[in-house]
Amino acid sequence: MNGLLRARRSLFAAVAASVFAAASLPALAQNAPVAPAPATTPAQPQPAAEPPKWPDFNTVVKDMTPMPGLFTIYRYKAEDNSKDQTRLLCQIPRALMKQDLLLATSISRGAQAGFQWDDYLVRFEIQGKLVVIAVPDARFVTNAAQTVNDAVSRTYNDSFLTAMPIVTYAPNGDPVVEMGGPLLAPLVNLPAPSGPGAAFAPRREMSTFPKVKAFPDNVLIDADIALAGRTGAGMSVGLTYSFRRLPAIGSFTPRIADERVGYFTTVRQDWAIKYTERENVIRYVNRWDVKKKDASLDLSPPEHPIVFVIEKTVPLQWRKYVAEGIAEWNKAYEKLGIVGAIVVQQQTDDNEFANVDPEDSRYNFIRWIVTGRGFAMGPSRADPRTGQILDADIIFDDSMLRFYFREFDTFGPAPVAAMMGPEFTTFLVEHPEFIPQGMTLDQVKDAARSLTGQGELLHESPMAGAQPTVDGAPLSHRLNPSRTECNYAVGLRQQLAMAHLAVAASGKKIPDRFIGDVIREIVAHEVGHTLGLRHNFKASAWLSETEIKKRRDTTDEPLVASVMDYNPVVYFAGDDIEKLRHFITPCIGPYDYWAIEYGYKSADKGGDEKAMLQQVAGQSSKREYAYATDEDTVGLTSVDPSANRFDLSDDPIAWSKSRVALCDALLKNIKTWAVKGNEPNYYLRSTYLTVMSHKASDMMYVSRLVGGQYFNRNRSGDPDAKPALQLLEPKRQREALDMLAGSIFKDDFFSTDAALLNDLPPSRWMDWYSNPISRIDFPAHQTVQSMQSFALLALVSPQVLQRVYDAELKSKADDKFTAAELISRVRNIVWGNLTQPGETKFTDAKPMLSSIKRNLQRQYVSYMLSIAESKPGALVSADLQSMASYSMEELSDQIGKLLAQANGQIDFATKAHLSQTKSQIDRTLNAPHMQMPGFGGGQIIIIGQPTGANQQQK
């Protein structure tokens, strides 16, 4: 761009100089002597005709077929192999220059087929012998009528995607450009495997354009891009470009967003807003242009309905449920007087949709794909100037409905990172001393990289990270923030797997109608995203467990406030699958109706839309309208224990107890039902891990109560407004600690049945489909450690300790849950009372402290010493650090007294553990702190400092 600017300046200087010279000539001539005119003027020779500036248009497009549309495309017939099939000429009307267009890209073939990819607001601009695809910065409002406009344009100038050479001009003056090369370059990053030796480069000579279509308002170009690898192996990826004319400004009325209602937003900054306003940022709701065709009618069809086409790839047996999931949202629009806001069509081989391309941005498709991962996603594209949604496509992976016997390491690095969010993984990378046992720093770094820039979705189901990838390529992509990468179906697939096991234990199977209900729920969830709605992870905390069971068994009412939560299947220990009325929430809930009202309700004729929206959003303090989304549920940094994934009911402790009861019932006789006589034993291993992973991960809901604070989005002027943050009652936090102490921190929470543990071999298949495990015997200790370490970190992490400590100033009650109490109680839970063994003499086979308890204690001490030895203020306040240090000093003293008085009654393993723990505590707490010059006053703790003449201590 700098070169083009320099060229413009040079051209301006040359033109100015010539104009100046021409204007000066008459003035100079007036002062010069006038020569007499000759009698006759000899004939001057005529200059030779200049060659044409551009090649002849007809010659350039000879043998090419024109395809008129938004712009005219010229290409050779596909069957003519004598021609360059990568050559694609485009005649761009001059009237289209500098007009706003949407360039949307999609993956049409390959592992990510069906994914919406990158999209841009673009403009065509002629610059010399080039047509540039410029990308204006849509974040900033420009208005030529405002005096600040020049400053805005100068500061936030355009970027560009590519420059296309002009090859000729059409007879009407339109430039004709070569677009084939730039599109095959390509214009966006492609989903290709990464890693050593996996770099891929595009090969134009091997690439093609399988499909090109031009329409009056859009052009679709499908490219098959060949990619060559360093090792000689290659691959191809289908990438579809769709250029689309954007609606005229003024044809759609943007709607101001409100943080109390969960919508995706389009955010713009307007520097012309008055200085008296608190912000110069405008946030628009992302929504369709859906309104009554006749506003005078109580019930009217929409002026522009939203049309979804179910792709013919959707299996026949599930089409009914897919259609019902889409149409479910019509109920919310009907309450606003709009009938048939959403229209569902079915694509077949011979109807009017037979040849419609799902990548065509004019159509909204529900697509069926087969990646092997089992997920669904509902992204949409919105006008970056107004938030008007223009296009949406939902993809549904077939594997969602297939129960695979895979090992799901729910507490491995990837799934833990997925569950806890990017802030948690960043914390572990920066403070590796807090990495739980069973993880490595490299694994955490890999997990952190996989979460970078995932758009709306900040973390997944805990099971998601344990899923296989396809062709070595991760299925997550850095999507445009206006879209969502939703992993509801990934986690729900694990819910189905668990339900499958529970039903199989009773000798039955899940009826197809319940599978259909799950499909309907997932589709409704993803369609909600395409309507503009974000996740609402508070919706499942609306009703009590008793009310949920009553509704499930006797009514068709919603079981949760919104389908935009990650809602679990509703199956409890003792349920008879054949007698259930519902298996999952059957319909949209009250929050969904309310959110659609905010986004799509029209003000009465002559009414004040701002006042109408305030009246709607002002109801947010109602229990059924509570809202929390992705950024409210990012693990250790999230305060609200009512915002969770795959929980149910208003009581996390009761819900966790129900899930543990179900898991215990399955574990009791697992060998009798998990594997049939002719099935391999590794099915038993995967079944056991699935049940145990669910049992342990359900403790997450309980641990979040400790240090919890309810976050309310209502405003102070709303009816029945609550404080923005409400501390949980101390009694409730103590109940949570009591439950954790009696469950996941006890040995008997984990199955120690030797016969079972000796019957859990891994699969030994060594092929592309399998994930071979090198260790054949079952890693019992590692499995327990990973589950306990994660639960422990949720109680003693610096974030939780600091939050509990700060909360002491936020309550005037006599009874407070303090940081001192938390530190003391957790230490007592893990270590208990280190009393003398009495008359008991422990042996190596029957130790005083079990191996499970020793590992838990070791992890606890590691966490607490990491806090104690950190730089004051780096992890927690100095006051908290003092408490952590003193707690460790007390523990060291208790261990010392026990060792001194045991008189040989303690077994070898316990004695080694206690001795090493005391030594570690004493060495860390008594290490000298040295002030090092040049390090800004920081401290370095030297452990095991040698003695010598040069030793200096401070």
Residue ranges: model-predicted function:
Residues 458-493, 509-514, 539-954:
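Conserved catalytic/binding loops enriched for acidic/polar residues
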Residues 13-24:
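Bacterial N-terminal signal peptides
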Residues 30-314, 332, 336, 347-510, ...:
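Auxiliary tRNA-acceptor-end handling modules of aminoacyl-tRNA synthetases
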Residues 97-98, 317-341:
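Zn2+-dependent metallopeptidase catalytic core
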Residues 314-318, 505-523:
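Short pre-active-site segment immediately N-terminal to the catalytic Zn-binding motif
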Residues 25-29:
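Sec/Tat signal peptide C-region and signal peptidase I cleavage site
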Residues 2-15:
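Bacterial N-terminal signal peptides that target proteins for export
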Residues 346-369, 517-524, 529-573:
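The catalytic-center signature of Zn2+-dependent metalloproteases
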